[in-house]
From Swiss-Prot:
Description of how the protein assembles with itself and partners: Heterodimer of AddA and AddB/RexB.
Organism: Lacticaseibacillus paracasei (strain ATCC 334 / BCRC 17002 / CCUG 31169 / CIP 107868 / KCTC 3260 / NRRL B-441) (Lactobacillus paracasei)
Keywords: ATP-binding, DNA damage, DNA repair, DNA-binding, Exonuclease, Helicase, Hydrolase, Isomerase, Nuclease, Nucleotide-binding
Protein name as annotated: ATP-dependent helicase/nuclease subunit A
HAMAP family reported in the protein's UniProt record: AddA
Family (UniProt): Belongs to the helicase family. AddA subfamily.
Gene that produces this protein: addA
UvrD-like helicase C-terminal domain span: 507-806
Amino acid sequence: MTQFTTSQQAAITHDGHDVLVSASAGSGKTTVLVERIIQKILKQHADITRMLIVTFTRAATAEMRTKIQTALKKALTERRHELSGEDRRHLANQIAMVNAAKISTLDAFSLQIVQTYYYVIDLDPGFRLLTDETERYMLQERVWDDLREQLYASDEAPAFEQLTANFSGDRDDSGLQDLMFELIRQAGATTDPKAYLEGLATPYAPEKWEATFSQQIWPRVKGQLLQIATSLTQASALANQLPNPIWYQQIQADLAPLQTLLETNAPTYDTVRSVLISHEFAAWSRISKGLDDADKDTKNAAKDLRDAAKKTWQNKLAPTFALAAEQIGDLLREAQPLVATLANVALKFEDALTAEKAARHVQDYSDIAHNALRILQQKDPQTGAPIADNYRASFDEVMVDEYQDISPLQEALLAAVSTTTPGDRFMVGDVKQSIYGFRLADPQLFIHKYQTFQDAPTDPAAPERIILAENFRSTKNVLAFTNLIFSQIMDPEVGDLSYDNAAALKYGALDYGDAHPAVKVLLYSKATSDEDSSDASELPGDADDNEPVDIATGQTQLVLAEIQRLINDPDAQLWDRQAQEYRRIHYRDITLLTRQTSQNSLIQTQFAAAGVPLFVADTKNFFKTTELMVMLALLKVIDNQKQDIPLVAVLRSPIVGLSADQLALIRLAAKQVPYYDAVTAFLQAEPKTPLAQRTHDMLTHFFNQLSHFRDLARENDLVTLLWAIYQDTGFLDYVGGTPGGSQRQANLQALIDRARTYEAGGFKGLFAFIHFITLMQKQDQDLAMPAQVDPDNDAVKLMTIHKSKGLEFPVVFLMQANKHFNMSDQTGTAILTKQGIGIKWLDPETRVEYELPQYQAAKAARQNQTLAEEMRLLYVALTRAQQRLYVVGATMSGNQLTSADKTVEKWAAAAEGEARVLAPQVRSGATSYLDWIGPALIRHPQARGLAETTIKPALVGDETEFTIEIDVNPQVTPTATPEKVSDDSGTMVDLSAWFKKAYPFQAATTTTGFQSVSEIKRAFDDPDTIDLVNADRFLGPKPPMRDLTAPAFLTETPSGISPAAIGTATHLLLQLVDLAKPITMASLRALRDQLTTTQVIAVDVAKHIDLTALIRFFETDLGRLLLAKPQQVHREVPFSMLLPADQVFEALADDPGEDVLIHGIIDGYVSDEQGVTLFDYKTDHNPNTAVLVDRYRGQLNLYAQALQDLQPKPVLHRYLVFLRTGTVVDLVASGAGK
């Protein structure tokens, strides 16, 4: 039985009031949350269906549900003899009810509210969830284009033109568009988007300027002035130790006006400005007479502190007060109308976007959340009771996991369904791990409760704070190192939270052995400081990365050398906590964490060269794969063949196959014209050489294909076009024969899937699709699914810090610790915050741009947010390590590699000051993790000898063990090298036998690694019926059957509509029909008409849907089951799975190492506490049920296997639903499923 700590036990048992559990990394918060639920069920006979349990991901929800059910079953088994009969019955009942419990994401909970009470807000329930970010962006883009044209043509055109000029560049008006999209996104995170937008101009009212200054600007300025005063006070204390008072007097002269200002209650803008602008710092006296060496050191230390304060005063603060209050008032009178116009346009855009979504019957998650909140603020028209009261009455407790990632909108939703007197909320999280600011999470909501809730309150109804500080994951040094860093860098001023004793990690993993390896800081560096000159290290890096490529390579080599040492050194071991013994380190124990994926390709290349296996968890390079780049280039050429770069890319690719010499030959035909014109000129000329003739023939063939593709693009959908390209060019076959062929073919298939989804969203046309893909690339979206970690795969793992959250690894390397923070959102003409907007105002007459005070305040607020989140990201990264932790970086000066001594000197200067926490200006001025880590370490006794710094008294007793290793030339030895062939000219090799030898895996050459269910269902049914050696046409890659030419009597009805089209439309109707309502002929007709109105189904096709057959189906036992359990019905479920090839194709039995990737879409299944009921609709005309069952048996076998892999429940029934005949066959019951 688990032994819980005192604080864990409190979190499990305390109730009757709101509880906030601040659970540090590795403190077992999920275990505590599950145990709290179990204890309530066991000891209080609580009903799990009366608990609302929410978290942020579907994976976490599924894991939570499984853990609760497993724990309840374990309790029933282990405590059966201790429990009374009533207790056993209650526990058994709760186990059965776990699947019905409200354990969900906040998005799913909001959706459930909307689906239940849609009629309260007059919402059409037949909406589709808009989950694709790129599709959402394109919808916004289309609405914005229409609105922009309307505004240019209206009376508001002059004001709109000024707005565009102020926020966009000279080339286009994309700046205003981007701002408008971000405004809508920011407003969407608030409880009242319209109020947020309407209030944007309020702080710009001239009459409210003083209030704006005192409430928004003065607190920030005062904080900076206090930092300056602290530095000057420290400098003054040092100067007072000197025999000559001149330096002390100089510093006091600087300090006096500052102290007077800070003592002033609510100073005006002009008062602050007067002090900052008028004060002059006297030149530092150079007198040295009478000073010994110690005095000189003290004098220099005082000067450094004064210089730092002077720099902040003169370079950061004074420039922001350049304008007098009167001048600011004049600017605000000009700027306020501009911001009011911005707000007005944003409101119109919001309304237009809402109307377009309604017309398309789509809702995104933000819409769902706002609609849910609107519903909770209404009364139920049927009962007259507030709907929120209904929810509050149905829950005994509201439990929230990962509470630190909550947004204001989500907080309002939870508050609406929670009681307050006494509170019934149980919130678990760690604000130090709040790393989702880009999703508009607001950690201040957690911090406010953390600071106001009490530890062990005397009032039983008062909200309580419980801190779980014990870490059961990591060794002592990992925790001590983390505490050492964060106790010096995190406080409310920079980091939002004080990293005090309560927040510090406590060692709790008492089962570790005696060895606690020291943390290592690995730095790639230059050899000596005199080498700091322009060289290769100045080469620009990736567009997405400030780090030069050679510096990233050096760091990777450092890591590789250390990994090879860990693997090869028998003394480098890990403690096996299960076996309670030491063991050797394996590659799979090691994980590399990065802030971004921009260097993944470089890291992969370096690891491959060294022979070190690497698994990349973040697949963000889909569009950078060769096959996708070639396909996108071809699509661009089909759309517009006069694009030089895509055209040359296609000509050079395997699709055409021209060599570099042939491309040069074409260019010689016309040198000073676009390349397409050169191709045209070349084709018109008479070929004079064999190479020219061959090139001419290849170009002629390609342009004939291109003409065909262009015709297809005009007359058909994108899926048909893409399949035609794959077939006619053989490109899909070609990539299958290259290294990683099955993955490349899967990538090309994913492009088709994306095209299908794109057109299903109502978008049409090749040009728009290319634009769609371009947007996906810009927004860093990917079509490839992240690969899943195989625990048996002995490979180093590479992933982002975000991806690692919630995970733990024996050995962790934090990479790129010198990489600059992304501050790009602190530039530009506007900065958005949750309080509003700060803008630069462009004078339309002079074209002079002014940074308004509101802009400076917004910039400071955004900078603080960014630094706090980067600090929390660092915390997450360090706390992933269980036993060994490495921090990897480079000694940098700007964007150049510098020597270690210069970097250490910079750290030592930043480490000055007596307080344990580093000076605020040092922490707020950091541009990378090393800017925090270096100064924090350099003050520690372990760093003695690395720099001439004073060890801080607060760190003298600190027992953290770490080393800083600097390497200028890391050496990596390839793990495996190719065996050299002996140079023996006297040896004759008979190659004829090799050429005559039969290839042992001939069958595999006629299959592809990527198969759809429809392509292999016959083979899966009865492998003996297929002769694989001669099955090229059946097994080769091909489009769906509807794309093949077939006799008209097979493919068309008398009206000319294909059965496939009717079947697809029928499936769509069954997918969208509302199972929560009675199914009638009228409701089916209404849904059909809606789909034709929105052009989802063609009118001609809709007429042939047999609605009577659908009514007949819902009258069967299976149909009634679907209607009885609508919430448990899952429809149109896509899946992919790997199967051993010899299971699918018997002829591959001799090749057991190969896998086949199978994909498909399951029509639907019902999941309840007993198991899963699978069903699949068929619209075949054949009346012979036995033949149809035989035809589709294998397909359902695959679906059942896929469902078994997706979730743990058994598949109890497999139904084939033949809609034409009204027959429903259970393959399991009939024995036909075997």
